[in-house]
């Protein structure tokens, strides 16, 4: 099942046009390699000798499923994704293995990644197609709270120059979770959202596409911080009851695209429920994302998040 945003079938909206872009965001849920290189508890946990028994075979099974998913999107939209924003990535080496050892090696993807100060050792990253664009400027925005750097993911920004010379600013986020309680953690998510607004204000750009796992739903107060700066393309989907994660039979929408107001009429967001990424709920009717582990037990899926897609229809003299 595939959910469509804004009442428009993206499949028939001309996404194969050379003047359009297909942008994906996906939280890959603990995308670690199988080697314990001594960089933290999560690195040890997700290793061949760790508690999860995260072996080379299991790692490459996940890599193959990620590649298959992107190829599925390529079939659906008439072109492989031009930009893929990712969350919960251990390091650049994981992405190199993904691109070199799966069917993605046939495509010209390049990596933008920087290590962050996240306490779990996970980062955000960008994959982009070299034939479609190149980065002109890359920067990080570090969220601060009460004068101290948050031990969370940095916000990754890349100013991308498209093949025709036009520019678009890509921003990838993974805001602090609700671990420890929603109210206790709210101030940290507010701080991350404030950092996002500060970054956007510094760009003086009207072609911003921000994406990420915001660990908040579109009606959360934190999104008021960016009112007037970015438009939340996920809001109509959320109002319909759609979501990207599912808990106790209920969908929640925490993965989103936020765009410059000038782009709102030329972009559409979709939640991808790719059949082989879904599994039946055991206690509730319906499907849920097929994750890699159920508690400590390996079950062979990819992530507890559905990927999301933004189709960006540039048109004549659009940017």
List where the protein language model places each region.
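Second-shell loop/turn segments in exported
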Residues: 49-59, 80-86, 113-114, 144-146, ...
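Extracytoplasmic, non-cytosolic globular domains
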Residues: 113, 156-238
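Beta-strand-turn-beta hairpins that frame and shape the catalytic cleft
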Residues: 16-23, 32, 132-134, 151-176, ...
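Active-site metal-binding loops of divalent metal-dependent hydrolases
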Residues: 28-31, 89, 175, 213-214, ...
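Active-site environment of divalent metal-dependent phosphoester hydrolases
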Residues: 91-93, 119-121, 178-180, 215-221, ...
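N-terminal, active-site-proximal structural segment of metallo-dependent hydrolase catalytic domains
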Residues: 11-102, 112-116, 122, 194, ...
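Metal-dependent phosphoester-hydrolase catalytic domains
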Residues: 13, 198-208, 216-319
């Amino acid at each position: 099942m595939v959910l469509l945003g804004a009442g428009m079938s993206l499949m028939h909206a001309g996404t194969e046009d050379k003047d359009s872009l297909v942008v994906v965001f996906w939280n890959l849920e603990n995308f670690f390699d199988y080697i314990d290189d001594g960089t933290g508890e999560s690195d040890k946990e997700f290793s061949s000798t760790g508690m999860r028994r995260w072996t080379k075979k299991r790692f490459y099974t996940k890599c193959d499923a990620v590649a298959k998913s992107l190829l599925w999107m390529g079939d659906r939209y008439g072109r492989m994704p031009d930009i893929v924003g990712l969350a919960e990535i251990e390091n650049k080496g994981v992405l190199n293995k993904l691109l070199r050892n799966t069917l993605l090696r046939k495509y010209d993807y390049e990596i933008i990644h920087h290590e962050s100060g996240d306490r779990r050792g996970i980062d955000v990253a960008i994959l982009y197609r070299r034939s479609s664009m190149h980065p002109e400027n890359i920067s990080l925005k570090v969220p601060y709270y009460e004068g101290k750097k948050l031990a969370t993911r940095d916000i990754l920004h890349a100013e991308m120059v498209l093949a025709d010379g036009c520019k678009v600013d890509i921003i990838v986020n993974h805001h602090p979770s609700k671990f420890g309680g929603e109210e206790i953690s709210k101030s940290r998510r507010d701080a991350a959202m404030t950092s996002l607004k500060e970054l956007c204000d510094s760009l003086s750009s009207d072609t911003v596409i921000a994406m990420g796992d915001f660990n908040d739903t579109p009606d959360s107060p934190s999104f008021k911080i960016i009112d007037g700066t970015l438009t939340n393309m996920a809001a109509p989907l959320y109002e319909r009851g759609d979501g990207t994660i599912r808990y106790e039979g209920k969908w929640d929408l925490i993965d989103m695209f936020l765009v410059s107001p000038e782009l709102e009429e030329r972009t559409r967001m979709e939640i991808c429920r790719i059949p082989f990424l879904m599994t039946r709920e055991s206690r509730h009717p319906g499907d849920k994302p097929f994750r890699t582990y159920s508690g400590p037990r390996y079950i062979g899926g990819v992530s507890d998040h559905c990927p999301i897609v933004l189709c960006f229809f540039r048109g004549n003299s659009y940017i």
